[in-house]
Regions:
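N-terminal secretory signal peptides
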Residues: 1-22, 29-34
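N-terminal "domain-start" segment that seeds a small globular fold
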Residues: 44-64
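C-terminal segment of classical bacterial N-terminal signal peptides
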Residues: 35-40
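Short active-site neighborhood of thiol/selenol oxidoreductases, capturing the structured segment around
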Residues: 68-81
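Cysteine-centric redox/oxidoreductase cores and disulfide-bonded domains
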Residues: 110-195, 199-228
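Conserved helix-turn-beta segment immediately C-terminal to the redox Cys motif
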Residues: 89-108
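Conserved redox-active cysteine motifs that mediate thiol-disulfide chemistry
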Residues: 80-90
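Soluble periplasmic/extracytoplasmic beta-strand elements of cell-envelope proteins
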Residues: 73-76, 103-107, 197-199
């Protein structure tokens, strides 16, 4: 699978989900904003559902960046080898700073090879030392080809205890693998074709945005959320 860049405006979620195909495109009946399991999404019910609010927005195994108490959530599906993910990172971070009220949920979706998988696993393991955001920032800022030794070196230079991260990865391999599986299931269920891909409030965004475009979709998501109240 290759990365996917789509500059089109995001597609809003509508309130009429009748088919599985609709669920692959949309969050389903405003489900995430309303906290209701999507009608036609994968899974059986409630929190076991791949596209439930709990699974997508509030996975307890994924630390939250940005404003943890924000009123709008951005979920980013990314790969550390994705050039578009790297390129848009400053745009996204500036948009978050501009707004100040956005939760950012970073979902590793390593689709570009073994180096991506290793990097994602290692970064997820850094949460046990409270360094997930710092580790993510270090690797998403790479401007060279990602390798396993390079990932370790980059993390060490960012102040991460890499030896501990490796031990934590080994001790929590099953749980970390499960996180990546959940992320993969969700991204595929949303119909994303590559990275970067986003859920912004109730909008599906299959591609990179500029700072201004992020600001616009955040504003649109906030307006849509208010209409639901």
């Amino acid at each position: 699978m290759t990365t996917h860049l789509d500059s089109r405006r995001p597609s809003p979620v509508i309130d009429d989900v009748r088919t599985r195909r609709s669920a692959l495109r949309l969050l389903g009946a405003g489900a995430l904003m309303a906290g209701i399991t999507p009608v036609a999404a994968i899974g059986q019910s409630n929190d076991d559902n791949v596209l439930s609010e709990a699974a997508v927005l509030r996975d307890p195994d994924i630390p939250v960046a940005g404003n943890a108490g924000g009123d709008i959530t951005i979920v980013e599906y990314f790969d550390y080898q994705c050039p578009y993910c790297r390129k848009l990172e400053p745009e996204l971070q500036q948009a978050l700073k501009d707004d100040g009220k956005v939760r950012l949920v970073l979902k590793d979706w390593p689709i570009l090879g073994p180096a991506s998988v290793y990097a994602s696993q290692l970064v997820l393991a850094t949460k046990f030392q409270g360094k997930f955001v710092e580790a993510h920032t270090a690797l998403i800022g790479l401007d060279v080809r990602l390798t396993e030794p390079g990932a370790r070196e980059r993390l060490a230079n960012a102040g991460i205890d890499v030896d501990r991260a490796i031990r934590d990865l080994q001790a929590n391999q099953e749980g970390i693998t499960a996180v990546l599986k959940r992320n993969d299931d969700q991204a595929k269920a949303f119909g994303f074709n590559g990275t970067p891909a986003f859920i912004v409030g109730k909008f599906r965004v299959p591609g990179a945005l500029t700072r201004q475009q992020f600001g616009q979709v955040i504003a649109d998501a906030r307006k849509a959320a208010k209409k639901k109240k």
